[in-house]
C-alpha cells in the first residue's frame, strides 16, 4: 500500500497542511492533484512519483508527515499549461487546487479548494487545444434486455469549448463506427460489470472514465437535460424518445459541470443525429479514403489538408465536421454549391479574394465565447472579440452584395449582425491592447471607472504630485528650501530646516525631529500617503473586480456570439471551397433522383496535387452497369481510380465542387471500401480475417444506393479459396445487394462474370513494355487486361535479378502445365507459353537484366584487385592462366 493511501486512512496523524491535502485528494481519486503553494503547484506522494515519471520532473523528499517522508514534485504556476497539455495527451486528468484564502489573515494552512478539473474531454484553454480540431467528451449508456444482452446504445457528446451538444442512439454493433466518426477524447461509461462486458473500446478510442451507474438514470438525465436547455420537454429537439441517449446526456452534463466547478451557460442547444441523415462511412472507409488522416497517421497529405485554405480556425474545424458528416439529402449540397457559385461570380468589390482578406481579421470567437461562458476568458480574448465585432460591418457589406444570389449567403448575412450593446460595452471597458493576464493590470480601459483611473493616476503620477505639492507649500509658507520627500520608514513628509520652523502653518503636524530639521505631515499629504502606499495594490484589486463584473455583464450575449461564430465558420468554409474550386479547376456536380454515378475526366484530388501530371479517367455506373471489374498491373492505378470515384462522390455530397470535367450523382446512402488490410494484432485477427470481416459488413449492409469499393478480395488465402470467394462475393453484390461496385482483381477468371451478369462490365488500366522496362499509362479502358506485368513490377521494386530469372522460368513451367492440362489460368494474365521458349526468354532476360553469375563475379573481383604496373612478366603469365580457368567455369558460360 502506498504512503498516500495508507496516510489517508488516518488523516489526524498528519500535519495540518497534509491533512488539508489528503482530504482534497480523497475527493479526487485517480486524478493528479496540482496543489497551489506560492508560485508552484506541488504534487505529493504517489502523485509526485507519477508526475515525475510522466513529466520528467525532479522527485524530492522534504520533511515528514505521520512519520513518513513527503515525496514532492512541482511545476511553476506560470508554465502550468504546458505541463497540463502533456498530461492530457497521455490521457491523465488533473485537479487544479488553488489558494482561496488570504495568507495574511489565515490561521493554519491557507484555505484551498479545487476550482476545476482538466480532463482529456473537457479542455477549453487555448494552450491545451488544437486550433483546427474539436475535442469531444462522450457518454455512453447501454440498454439491456431481460437476458442482459445489450439492445441499444445511447450516445451524448459535447464540445465544451463551443457548447455544441449532440445525441444519437445506435445499435451495439454500430458503436465502433460512431466512435470513429466522432473521435471523442474521453468516453464516460458506467462502472457496472454488465456495461463493461457488453462493450470493448476500440484501440484508438479516447481515454475511458468510469462513473457511478446512477449518473446514467434516464429519468434524472432527461430532467437534467431539460434544465440545461431551459425547456419543459425535449419534443422540440426530437429527443423525447431517445431514452438511452438522455441517460447518457445526464451523466455527461453532470461530469462536465463538476470538472468546471460551475454551470455550463453556453450549452443551450441540442442536435439529434440520425443514421439516415448522413452518408454512412464505416471506420475502414474513413481510414482508406484518408479524409483527415493518412494511413500512416499523419495529417497530410489528406483530403482535409488539401481543402483547408480557411482563413479562420473556426472554418477549419467545420471542414473536418463536414467531411465526416456528408449529408444524404442532395438539397443541402446544392445549397452550399449555390453559395460557392455566387461567391465565385461576385462583383469586383465583393470578390472572393476580398472576402477572404476580411475573414483573416476574424478571431476564434467560437472558443472565446465558450471561455466567456465559463468565466475563464482572458483579457486578450475580450479584445479579440471586440475587434472581430468591429470588423463585421465591412465583411457584411461584401456578403450583402452576393446574398441575393444564394439563400445560404442571405441567411449568413442576417446572422452576422453583432450584438451592439455587447460591442459598445467591450469598446468602453477593454483597453486597446490589454495585458495577457488580469493580475498584470492594464486591462480595463481608461475612462471606464473613475475610481480605477484615480488609483492609476496616484500610482503613475506620484512623483509629479510631490513636485506640485512642494511648489504650492513653498508659495503658501514662504519657506524657500521646503522639501516634500518620501522614505520607506517614515513614508511621505515635508522637511523644514530649524531656522524656518517659525513659518510652519498650524496644519503641519510634526512627524520626526532631526538635528538640523523638522519633518511634518499635513492632512492633504496624509490622505495622499494613504492612497499612494496602496494605490497599485488597490488598483489591481479594483481592476480584478471590474473584470469579473464585466464577464458577468457579457453572459447575456453568449447566444448572439455563438450565432455570429457559426455564421463566420460557414462563410469561411464556403469561401475556401470557392478558392479551391478556382485554383484546382473543379466543377459543380449535378444531382438526380435516378440511380447512378457519371464522372467524366475525374481526378484524384490529393494525388493530383502531389504529381506533375495526372491522367483523368471516366467512371460510369448505372442501373444497367452496376459493377466494374477492374484488372491491370500492380501500380497501374486501380486503387487510385477507385478511391477517386469515392472521393468525388463524397465531395459532391459535402457541397464542394469536384475534380472532374463533369459529374452527376444519384442517391448515395453509404460508401464502403475494402482496400488493403493489415493484421489486427490488438484484436487477434489476421490480415485475411480483417479482410473477410470488412467484406461481411459490406455484404450484409450494402443497398442498391450504396457505393462499394472492393480491391483484390480473396488474396489473403490460397489461390483456389481466394478465387472462389471473390467470384461468390462479386455475384452476391450483383444479384442480392444491387449496389454500385468497383471491383479490382487479379483473378483473370472473374472477367467472365459479365457473360453471366450483363450488369457487370470489364475495364482495365493498361501498361506497355518500353525497352527493358514498363510504362504505366494509368488510363482506364474498356475490356479486361491481357497481362499482369507482375515480374516487371517486382523488378522495379528492386527484387534481385537472380530471383526474377528464377520466377520467369517457373512461370513458363506453370504455363506449360496449364497448357497441357486444360484448367483455368489462376492469378495470371499472360497467355500460356510452351517451355520451348524458355531459352529465348532467358536470352532476352540476360540482355534486359545483365546479371553476373558467381564465377564471373569472382573473375571481375579478381581483375579489380590487380594493378598491371606491379606485375612482373612471370606473374602476368600465371595470372592469365588463372583467369582463363575462371572464365571457363560452367556458371560463367553466359
From Swiss-Prot:
InterPro entries hit by this protein: DNA_mismatch_repair_MutS (IPR005748), DNA_mismatch_repair_MutS-lik_N (IPR007695), DNA_mismatch_repair_MutS/MSH (IPR017261), DNA_mismatch_repair_MutS_C (IPR000432), DNA_mismatch_repair_MutS_clamp (IPR007861), DNA_mismatch_repair_MutS_core (IPR007696), DNA_mismatch_repair_MutS_N (IPR016151), DNA_mismatch_repair_MutS_sf (IPR036187)
Swiss-Prot/TrEMBL keywords: ATP-binding, DNA damage, DNA repair, DNA-binding, Nucleotide-binding
Annotated GO biological processes are: mismatch repair
Q: Which residues form a coiled coil?
A: none
List of residues binding ATP = 632-639
Q: Would you name any one GO CC term?
A: cytosol
Pfam families for this protein: MutS_I, MutS_II, MutS_III, MutS_IV, MutS_V
List the molecular function annotations (GO) for this entry: ATP binding; ATP-dependent DNA damage sensor activity; damaged DNA binding; mismatched DNA binding
Name the family the entry cites: Belongs to the DNA mismatch repair MutS family.
Q: What does this protein do?
A: This protein is involved in the repair of mismatches in DNA. It is possible that it carries out the mismatch recognition step. This protein has a weak ATPase activity.
Q: What is this protein called?
A: DNA mismatch repair protein MutS
The record lists the organism as: Paraburkholderia phytofirmans (strain DSM 17436 / LMG 22146 / PsJN)
- Gene designation per UniProt: mutS
Amino acid at each position: 500500500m502506498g504512503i498516500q493511501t495508507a496516510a489517508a486512512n488516518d488523516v489526524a496523524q498528519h500535519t495540518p497542511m497534509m491533512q488539508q491535502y489528503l482530504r482534497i485528494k480523497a475527493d479526487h481519486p485517480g486524478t493528479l492533484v496540482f496543489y497551489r503553494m506560492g508560485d508552484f503547484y506541488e504534487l505529493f506522494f504517489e502523485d509526485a512519483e507519477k508526475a515525475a515519471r510522466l513529466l520528467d520532473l525532479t522527485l524530492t523528499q522534504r520533511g515528514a508527515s505521520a512519520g513518513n517522508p513527503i515525496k514532492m514534485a512541482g511545476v511553476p504556476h506560470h508554465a502550468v499549461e504546458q505541463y497540463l497539455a502533456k498530461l492530457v495527451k497521455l490521457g491523465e486528468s488533473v485537479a487544479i487546487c488553488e489558494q482561496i484564502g488570504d495568507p495574511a489573515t489565515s490561521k493554519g494552512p491557507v484555505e484551498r479548494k479545487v476550482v476545476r478539473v482538466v480532463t482529456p474531454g473537457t479542455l477549453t484553454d487555448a494552450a491545451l487545444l488544437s486550433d483546427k480540431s474539436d475535442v469531444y467528451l462522450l457518454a455512453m449508456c447501454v440498454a439491456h434486455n431481460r437476458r442482459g444482452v445489450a439492445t441499444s446504445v445511447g450516445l451524448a457528446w459535447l464540445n465544451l469549448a463551443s457548447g455544441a451538444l449532440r445525441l444519437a442512439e445506435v445499435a451495439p454493433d454500430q458503436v465502433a463506427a460512431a466512435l470513429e466518426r466522432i473521435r471523442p477524447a474521453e468516453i464516460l461509461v458506467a462502472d457496472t460489470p454488465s456495461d463493461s462486458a457488453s462493450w470493448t473500446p476500440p484501440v484508438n478510442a479516447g481515454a475511458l472514465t468510469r462513473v457511478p451507474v446512477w449518473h446514467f438514470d434516464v429519468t434524472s438525465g432527461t430532467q437534467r437535460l431539460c434544465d440545461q436547455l431551459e425547456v419543459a420537454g425535449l419534443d422540440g429537439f426530437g429527443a423525447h424518445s431517445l431514452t438511452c441517449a438522455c441517460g447518457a446526456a445526464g451523466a455527461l452534463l453532470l461530469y462536465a459541470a463538476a470538472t468546471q466547478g460551475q454551470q455550463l451557460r453556453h450549452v443551450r442547444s441540442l442536435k439529434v443525429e440520425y443514421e439516415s441523415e448522413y452518408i454512412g462511412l464505416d471506420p475502414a472507409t474513413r481510414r482508406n479514403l484518408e479524409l483527415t488522416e493518412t494511413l500512416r497517421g499523419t495529417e497530410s497529405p489528406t483530403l482535409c489538408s488539401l481543402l483547408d485554405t480557411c482563413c479562420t480556425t473556426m472554418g477549419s474545424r467545420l471542414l473536418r465536421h463536414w467531411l465526416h458528416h456528408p449529408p444524404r439529402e442532395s438539397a443541402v449540397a446544392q445549397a452550399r454549391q449555390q453559395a460557392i457559385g455566387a461567391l465565385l461570380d461576385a462583383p469586383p468589390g465583393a470578390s472572393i479574394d476580398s472576402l477572404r482578406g476580411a475573414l483573416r481579421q476574424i478571431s476564434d470567437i467560437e472558443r472565446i465565447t465558450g471561455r466567456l461562458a465559463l468565466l475563464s476568458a482572458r483579457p486578450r480574448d475580450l479584445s479579440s472579440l471586440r475587434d472581430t465585432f468591429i470588423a463585421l460591418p465591412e465583411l457584411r457589406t461584401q456578403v450583402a452584395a452576393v446574398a441575393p444570389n444564394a439563400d445560404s449567403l442571405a441567411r449568413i448575412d442576417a446572422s452576422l449582425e453583432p450584438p451592439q450593446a455587447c460591442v459598445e460595452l467591450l469598446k468602453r471597458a477593454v483597453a486597446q491592447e490589454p495585458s495577457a493576464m488580469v493580475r498584470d493590470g492594464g486591462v480595463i480601459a481608461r475612462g471606464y471607472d473613475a475610481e480605477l483611473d484615480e488609483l492609476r493616476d496616484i500610482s503613475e503620477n506620484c512623483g509629479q504630485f510631490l513636485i506640485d505639492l512642494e511648489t504650492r507649500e513653498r508659495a503658501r509658507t514662504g519657506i524657500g528650501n521646503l522639501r516634500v520627500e518620501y522614505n520607506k520608514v517614515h513614508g511621505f513628509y515635508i522637511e523644514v530646516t530649524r531656522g524656518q520652523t517659525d513659518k510652519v502653518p498650524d496644519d503641519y503636524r510634526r512627524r520626526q525631529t532631526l538635528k538640523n530639521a523638522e519633518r511634518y505631515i499635513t492632512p492633504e499629504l496624509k490622505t495622499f500617503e494613504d492612497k499612494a502606499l496602496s494605490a497599485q495594490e488597490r488598483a489591481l484589486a479594483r481592476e480584478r473586480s471590474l473584470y469579473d463584473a464585466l464577464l458577468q455583464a457579457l453572459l447575456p450575449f453568449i447566444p448572439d456570439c455563438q450565432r455570429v461564430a457559426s455564421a463566420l465558420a460557414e462563410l469561411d468554409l464556403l469561401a475556401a471551397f470557392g478558392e479551391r474550386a478556382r485554383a484546382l479547376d473543379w466543377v459543380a456536380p449535378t444531382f438526380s433522383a435516378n440511380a447512378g454515378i457519371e464522372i467524366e475526366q475525374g481526378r484524384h484530388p490529393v494525388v493530383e496535387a502531389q504529381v506533375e501530371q495526372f491522367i483523368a479517367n471516366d467512371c460510369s455506373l448505372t442501373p444497367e452497369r452496376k459493377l466494374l471489374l477492374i484488372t491491370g498491373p500492380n501500380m497501374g492505378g486501380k486503387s487510385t481510380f477507385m478511391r477517386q470515384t469515392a472521393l468525388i462522390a463524397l465531395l459532391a455530397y459535402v457541397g464542394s465542387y469536384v475534380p472532374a470535367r463533369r459529374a452527376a450523382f444519384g442517391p448515395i446512402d453509404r460508401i464502403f471500401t475494402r482496400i488493403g488490410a493489415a493484421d489486427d494484432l490488438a484484436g487477434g485477427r489476421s490480415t485475411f480475417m480483417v479482410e473477410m470481416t470488412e467484406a461481411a459488413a459490406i455484404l450484409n449492409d450494402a443497398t442498391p444506393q450504396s457505393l462499394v469499393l472492393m480491391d483484390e478480395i480473396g488474396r489473403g488465402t490460397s489461390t483456389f479459396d481466394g478465387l472462389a470467394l471473390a467470384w461468390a462475393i462479386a455475384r452476391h453484390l450483383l444479384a442480392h445487394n444491387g449496389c454500385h461496385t468497383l471491383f479490382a482483381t487479379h483473378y483473370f477468371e472473374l472477367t467472365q462474370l459479365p457473360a453471366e451478369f450483363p450488369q457487370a462490365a470489364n475495364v482495365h488500366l493498361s501498361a506497355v513494355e518500353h525497352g527493358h522496362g514498363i510504362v504505366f499509362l494509368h488510363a482506364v479502358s474498356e475490356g479486361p487486361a491481357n497481362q499482369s506485368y507482375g515480374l516487371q513490377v517486382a523488378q522495379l521494386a528492386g527484387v534481385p535479378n537472380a530471383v526474377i530469372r528464377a520466377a520467369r522460368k517457373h512461370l513458363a513451367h506453370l504455363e506449360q502445365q496449364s497448357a497441357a492440362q486444360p484448367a483455368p489460368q489462376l492469378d495470371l494474365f499472360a497467355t500460356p507459353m510452351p517451355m520451348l521458349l524458355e531459352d529465348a526468354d532467358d536470352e532476352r532476360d540476360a540482355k534486359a537484366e545483365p546479371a553476373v553469375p558467381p564465377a564471373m563475379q569472382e573473375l571481375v573481383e579478381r581483375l579489380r584487385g590487380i594493378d598491371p604496373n606491379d606485375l612482373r612478366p612471370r606473374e602476368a603469365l600465371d595470372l592469365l592462366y588463372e583467369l582463363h580457368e575462371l572464365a571457363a567455369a560452367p556458371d560463367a558460360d553466359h
